[in-house]
Amino acid sequence: MLSVFTSPSRYTQGKGATAALGREMTALGLEGPVLIIAGRTVIGLLAPAWQRSLDEAGFKHAVHRFSGECSLTEIERVKAAGRELGARTIVGAGGGKVLDTARAAAAGLGLPVVNCPTVASSDAPCSALSVIYTDEGVFQEYRFYRKNPDLVLVDTEVIAQAPPRLLVAGMGDALATWFEARTCVA
């Protein structure tokens, strides 16, 4: 029996890690322009840090506001924004649905993806799949990818500001994953 382990190409974590976004992308050989997908709250919180970090690293970038649902409509909207920008890298910043959308759009465009989670509520940041919903929020499909994200950048200072209920949700998700893994081994 073979065992297989897959993970992001690079995982970076620490207080203030958002300030290292450009440097971490450069270390992986990622290129700009960079399209960042995030919700309103996350944009308000992190846009100044993205601006400084990406400017210092020489990356042109644009921010695209997430609609709130990882749907085929939103994925196509992000892909269109990426094409219009001439994006060479897609960055998702936020919760699981934002990260799933960024991953799906990047895969559809054949681009690398960087995930910057702002909550610790699931294992979505490191995953090689997206959960797709209808525009109304009803589950539609799982979309699997050949590889995990190119970079996962976790700013623990940002994660610590998230609502406690989302951390508790992440603990539940981790526990469920443990039981799933045990079942597979048994």
Cite the ranges covered by each PLM segment.
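Short glycine-/acidic-enriched loop or helix-start segments at secondary-structure transitions
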Residues: 46-48, 100-103, 125-126, 163
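Short secondary-structure boundary/capping segments
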Residues: 1-3, 26, 105, 141-144
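Glycine-/small-residue-rich active-site loops that bind phosphorylated ligands and cofactors
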Residues: 42, 69-71, 97, 120, ...
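A short, small-residue-rich loop immediately preceding and capping a beta-strand
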Residues: 82-105, 109-120
